[in-house]
Amino acid sequence: MKPVTLPLLQQAANAFQFGGPVVCTLDHYGEGHINDTYVVWREDRSKRFILQRINTDTFTDPVGLMENVCGVTRHLRAKILAAGGDPMRETLNVVPTLTGGSCYMDADGGAWRAYDFVEGTVCLQQVGSEADFCTVAETLGRFQNQLSDYPAATLHETIARFHDTANRYANFEKALAADSMGRAAGIAEEIAFVRAREADCHVLLDQLAAGEIPLRVTHNDTKINNVLIDETTGKGLCVIDLDTVMPGLSAYDFGDSIRTGANDCAEDEPDQSKVHFDLHLYEVFAKGYLSTAGASMSLAEKKSLAWGARLMTLECGTRFLTDYLEGDHYFHTARPGHNLDRARTQ
């Protein structure tokens, strides 16, 4: 995609119903690295908005993506209103274009969308306390519960086979067979570790195929910084970054949160002696999640959550190892062996 210029940003901003002229700057907002995210203000500084250019290299169907976002946020809004909540703070709100659409396509093929800015909130970048992790868990569980009656099969798959662990394993075997970089000989222990767990990769998909667990609307990127928290009360408000909302399993969202939150070191820590799984944080998260999501889940689905924690970690580690074998093309690396360190940490 072409770099965003100020004229392009202003042109995109002028395509949305912001209630008056807005002021733009090229200062990027937030910690995300996929989309281009900016804050725009009304000229009178009465209100601000999030304006984003969707990364169409990653999300090749931005129209389908926004159909997902609009459908899910409408559903959430209705649930929040019925419960007496505040839909302007408890879910994302899409700002329509001047023509009533959900995204604007610029002359270069760039896809833009806008949201109301949720004021008075923070995103946690790491787990600072048990209370923080519990708050994130409760918010994600509530998100799951509110969408439990949404027809998941109607959603577009924005990234094909994203959490298909068996397919990720197959890709690993292809990369290993090709060994295009000649790296396989140096990672025999890691290869054996993954291969010993091939059967595990099929467990959740087999349960789904057997009808033991249901297809759900899942977020699929449940890092703790994708939850907005009220900066005054500390209450979890809403889940953001809905680009990967797709049909999936509740175990995926539960497991990915555990993968990132219950590991007490950086994802790319090179010293493996520092890597530990905090079982107590797992228990804290599980209790918080089930306190808000549990009413809509069967016993079999609740039991599947532990498998989610195991498989999301295995899947991510396998993806890092696959990328290492293929020459580090997918994940950005900052040093030799970076993806190998990431794989080992998982």
Tell where the protein language model's regions lie, with residue ranges.
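Amphipathic, Lys/Arg-enriched alpha-helical patches that create a basic surface
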Residues: R344-Q346
